[in-house]
Amino acid sequence: VGYTEHAENRPTFFANHLFFLMGMQWVTLATNLVEFFIAWEIMLVPTYFLILFWGVPETRTRTAIKFWLYTQAGAVTILIGFGMIAYLVSVQTGTLTLDMQVIQTVVPALTGSLTTLKVIYVLLAAGFLVKMAVFPLHWWLPPVHAEAPTPISVLLSGAMIETGAYAMVRFNTIILSSVAIDLSFWVAMLGVLTMFYGGIMALAQRDIKRLLAYSSVSQMGYVLFAIGVFTVSGVTGGLFHLVSHALSKGLLFMCAGAVIHQTQLRDIGAMGGLSNKMPVTAFAAAVGAMSIAGSPPLAGFASEWLMFLGGFHAYESTGNTPFLVLSVVAISSIILSASYMLRFFTTVFLGPHPEDLEEVHEAPRSMTLSMTVLAVLTLIFGVFPALAVDVIKPLVEIISGILPWR
């Protein structure tokens, strides 16, 4: 609420906000293909209007259209993939069914249609990876995250892009498990490329929200790597990372929004020394930055450790040396994560502050309270990762053909 105190037409803003939340929740609760696709599209509509009417005035129309076109293109490939799945299942069972439970039972047994299933895998992955903003399908994300109102940036980076990863696991990993192992290395490699691309681009940014947006691209690369290795430990870590990233990145966008609200600046080069002026915000930003960088004992460390462990388990299970090389390269990307997070924190909060920021003071309690809650949760899931792992792991272990936790 504090972030929108100066927004025009707040009732309409919050109505769209709730509609957006409903779409994301419906995606996770959908039980058939049509229901899932409707929910997937519902996420798009309120987000478009939130950007169009409450985004940065100079660029919001162009940014909203870019978001619409990219996500609609992804939706088309998903729709084609769903149609092909429905056709294959109807041929196999003799009846048209869109129920995911039935599809999940029938599709893994279609051993005579592996080539077609691989085509479906690629079509669905293309649509879901647009939502995840994986390189090279990420171009919509930096301007949208940077120019959307802070509450929407928090949900876009902390929740909406995660729905793409959730869908990848639900369809590509579970339903299409019979071909997932054949394509796993290429998916993992795309994840590693995304890690490095997003990290390098984040290092080059001066706009505080755009830096965090490219960081989200990099972090989705971690998740895609974990999905790609197709091991219990990797997929468990990837799903856990959705939780840790939602907490950590949501926290960082809240901190960035508070800084922009108090200083009226977005250029981190014009900031500095804000830890003296905004100590609660600085503490919360430190927690979020350390978690994204993979520092113990925070949630980001626990989830990243599991994801990288999954890469080595893939090598142990398959004897495929490229998995070993890819895992080592993936681990080295932590250097980039630490670098851009260190640059973010030191440039904004440490050192002397410019004279024109002399009158800056701490953000309102309506902002600092929400930051504190997310910071505490980030610490709790880091110290007690079993809170998430013990829920996720048993569900991952039943995926057909997945490589075991060794």
Q: Where do the language-model regions lie?
A:
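Cytoplasmic/organellar membrane-interface segments at the starts of transmembrane helices
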Residues: A148, S275-T281, M341-R406
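Short phosphate-coordinating micro-motif centered on Lys-Gly-acidic
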Residues: E41
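Central hydrophobic cores of alpha-helical transmembrane segments
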Residues: N16-H17
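Hydrophobic transmembrane alpha-helices and their helix-loop junctions in integral membrane proteins
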Residues: V1-A7, P11, F20-F36, P46-T347
